[in-house]
Amino acid sequence: MVEITAAELEAAEKIFGERLDLAKRYVEHLATSGTERGLIGPREIPRLWSRHVLNCAVIESAIAMDSHVADVGSGAGLPGLCLAIARPDLELTLIEPLERRVIWLQEVVDDLGLDNVTIMRTRAELAVGMVDADVVTARAVSALSNLAGLTIPLLNGHGEVVAIKGRSAAEEIEKAKKVIRKLGGVETSVVVCGQELLEEPTTVVRIIVNKPGKTA
């Protein structure tokens, strides 16, 4: 069983509430079959809670109630499955092109009984028109200048992109601002999530999209 510190447990209890047991089971999947199948590196096991699950789950505070969220490049379900567990009000579509990852994701979803998750085996650019998302999330997919083109079109002209980034967030925004504006991004900002819960809060880039000619 993956160890969890007192501080991590306190944060997890606040984020996941009565669904904490589901989060613990998800972490065990990451530590066992997730590692065996190459979705998570073995060295990450001791920090699955802090660096991965909690780091992702805290972005739920940036997502409105009852949103349909498309998670691009879901991989091991970070942040998609974290959000599905923390927020049963959300409808999640996990977009992942690699078959072995899709198979693993489906096994975990089935085991946890997550009825608010759909998994699509495809590339983000091919999913345009197939997903009607209010919010698009991503973590460790690519630089923002490229990521904008993979995420914004999934919003059908309006909504938000919430991308987990690191210390280079502001620099990435500067480099991507022309692309973002061209795609319909009207406001881009850096948001810090989990300041009161985590020792190292999560930095996200938030893009509000409202493309001319499109209505909510």
Curated annotation (Swiss-Prot):
GO terms for molecular function: rRNA (guanine-N7-)-methyltransferase activity. InterPro entries: rRNA_ssu_MeTfrase_G, SAM-dependent_MTases_sf. Its EC number is 2.1.1.-. Gene3D superfamilies: Vaccinia Virus protein VP39. The keyword Methyltransferase applies. S-adenosyl-L-methionine binds at G73, L78, A124, E125, R139. Pfam families: GidB. It is found in: Cytoplasm. Keywords: Cytoplasm, Methyltransferase, rRNA processing, S-adenosyl-L-methionine, Transferase. One of its GO terms (cellular component) is cytosol. The keyword Magnesium does not apply. SUPFAM superfamilies: S-adenosyl-L-methionine-dependent methyltransferases (SSF53335). Belongs to the methyltransferase superfamily. RNA methyltransferase RsmG family. HAMAP family: 16SrRNA_methyltr_G. NCBIfam families: rsmG_gidB (TIGR00138). Specifically methylates the N7 position of guanine in position 518 of 16S rRNA. This is Ribosomal RNA small subunit methyltransferase G. It comes from Paenarthrobacter aurescens (strain TC1). The gene is rsmG.
